[in-house]
């Protein structure tokens, strides 16, 4: 992952894109999902620029850390349970290093469900928590988990998510933070 180690907001995707983060070495960098995400982050003043092309592009994100559950591209974009399990320790380490973390924004249902399963290893969560875009849930350690549709080209092109929806969610997070 990358960003501000003093982050209050953690943005979690599922995996690096084969021709984006996997190629560039930075999550949501050099792909269409990243173009959408960083435009939104820039417009709500979390990022200093509206693009993320490569790790030398000068991008800075304020009080935010961005990562993926998987650290490599899953074959055929379908992660196996073993891959998810093997990578979960890396995400747990990232979370434990973010001492000021207050809000976790998951991008996509699979990222949401897998983030939750990692949390359930550490905490007894009795409440039923379901993926619903824009829904927020208080976690046992006081952090807030928020679900969002993934900003994939398919979701953007079919208008499942748009710039206004994502910006509204980021503004909501700003009020929680």
Residues covered by each model-derived region:
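A polyanion-binding, active-site-adjacent surface
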Residues: 1-131, 135, 139-177
């Amino acid at each position: 992952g990358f960003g501000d180690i003093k982050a209050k907001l953690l943005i979690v995707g599922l995996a690096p894109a084969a021709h984006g983060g996997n190629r560039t070495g930075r999550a949501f960098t050099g792909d269409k999902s990243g173009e959408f995400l960083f435009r939104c982050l820039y417009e709500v003043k979390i990022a200093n620029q509206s693009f993320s092309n490569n790790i030398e592009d000068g991008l800075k994100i304020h009080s935010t850390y961005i990562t993926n559950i998987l650290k490599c591209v899953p074959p055929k974009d379908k992660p196996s349970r073993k891959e998810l399990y093997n990578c979960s320790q890396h995400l747990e380490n990232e979370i434990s290093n973010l001492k000021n973390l207050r809000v976790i924004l998951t991008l996509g249902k699979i990222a949401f469900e897998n983030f939750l399963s990692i949390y359930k290893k550490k905490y007894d969560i009795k409440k039923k928590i379901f993926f619903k875009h824009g829904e927020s849930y208080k976690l046992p350690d006081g952090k807030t988990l928020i679900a969002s549709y993934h900003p994939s080209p398919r979701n953007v092109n079919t208008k499942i998510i748009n710039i206004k929806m994502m910006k509204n969610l980021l503004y909501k997070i700003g009020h929680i933070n």
